[in-house]
Amino acid sequence: MDRLKSHLTVCFLPSVPFLILVSTLATAKSVTNSTLNGTNVVLGSVPVIIARTDHIIVKEGNSALINCSVYGIPDPQFKWYNSIGKLLKEEEDEKERGGGKWQMHDSGLLNITKVSFSDRGKYTCVASNIYGTVNNTVTLRVIFTSGDMGVYYMVVCLVAFTIVMVLNITRLCMMSSHLKKTEKAINEFFRTEGAEKLQKAFEIAKRIPIITSAKTLELAKVTQFKTMEFARYIEELARSVPLPPLIMNCRTIMEEIMEVVGLEEQGQNFVRHTPEGQEAADRDEVYTIPNSLKRSDSPAADSDASSLHEQPQQIAIKVSVHPQSKKEHADDQEGGQFEVKDVEETELSAEHSPETAEPSTDVTSTELTSEEPTPVEVPDKVLPPAYLEATEPAVTHDKNTCIIYESHV
């Protein structure tokens, strides 16, 4: 019985390692199966977005890198679309040269080599593999730095500057034209009707110590009136145009000119000699010469010394004595006025009047009687004032006698 137990024990002991081996093999198989199953889970994954980027800001002219940021097993394939849904493709020839504007890498990077302002917008990355597809969108913003706006503003500034310059030049031309017209009008006035006649009349009045005729007075009055009228016209013309007040005080200037030539300022009086009993009350027959005007050293008594360099001129004075008719004498006594006429008008009235008591006597045609003074004609020299003063009382004794003085240069 003991032998049988020992034999069973010996038989059982060899079977234990076998069981351990069998269990070990079974455990190894299960582990292998579990490992293989885990490997299959890791290698077969759907693409996932590992990072999200909202927008990218790029300066115009620079390059831009846009990352899709998608991971998957196996590696997904990437496609890029712009904001209008157009698929971006890299041309083969550009890919071989390594150039081109759009460069797409296998890792999901989109490289825009030279960004323009028209490239702004949203870019969508589509990543796909055998397990699925995922999309990722990134917005590209471009900073506009092109020189077109600078050129635009430069053109606007040049146009504005040109307009301002044209307006200024037009205004200056209008001012210049206005001043030229004003100057031309003033010069034309004084050249035709102004200072020339007035100066001539007063030069004759200065050279002869008597008033020549009533026509000189009329000329002076007309000239003064026209001068003042032109001054008012120039003043109104200057006020009508919005220009600087260059000739606003033209009337004052004209009045000063009148004072210089002796029409406004009180000075020395020279009165024409009238017959006895006749009052020279008419103020129109009185000329005034200002005291401020001094005669020059010229022998011709000019207002300036210009005649010192000129040849001397001689003045001849012709005196005509004409008896008045009875009708004219009666009119003078009744009306109490004395009218002065020119030499030509007096001679014509004396020749054609049928009521004249006796014919007029002229120094060149008729000789006077011993009772009347002999008229004197000096063709080549100026009569001295003493001779004139000596002959005047003899002539003025007759109330019916009219004395006419005529001067010739």
Curated annotation (Swiss-Prot):
Residues 339-355 have a biased composition (Basic and acidic residues). It is a single-pass type I membrane protein. The chain crosses the membrane at residues 150-172. InterPro entries: Ig-like_dom (IPR007110), Ig-like_dom_sf (IPR036179), Ig-like_fold (IPR013783), Ig_I-set (IPR013098), Ig_sub (IPR003599), Ig_sub2 (IPR003598). Residues 173-409 are cytoplasmic. Residues 29-149 are extracellular. It comes from the Eukaryota. It is found in: Cell membrane; Nucleus; Cytoplasm. Pfam families: I-set (PF07679). Residues 1-28 form the signal peptide. GO terms for cellular component: cell junction; cytoplasm; neuron projection; nucleoplasm; nucleus; plasma membrane. SUPFAM superfamilies: Immunoglobulin. Residues 47-141 form the Ig-like C2-type domain. The modification Phosphoserine is found at residues 298, 303, 306-307. Highly expressed in testis. The keyword Protein transport does not apply. The keyword DNA damage does not apply. Keywords: Cell membrane, Cytoplasm, Disulfide bond, Glycoprotein, Immunoglobulin domain, Membrane, Nucleus, Phosphoprotein, Signal, Transmembrane, Transmembrane helix. Disulfide bonds join 68-125. Residues 292-311, 320-385 are annotated as: Disordered. Glycans are attached at residues 33, 37, 67, 111, 135. May participate in the nuclear signaling of EGFR and MAPK1/ERK2. May a have a role in metastasis. This is Microfibrillar-associated protein 3-like. It comes from Homo sapiens. The lineage of its organism: Eukaryota, Metazoa, Chordata, Craniata, Vertebrata.
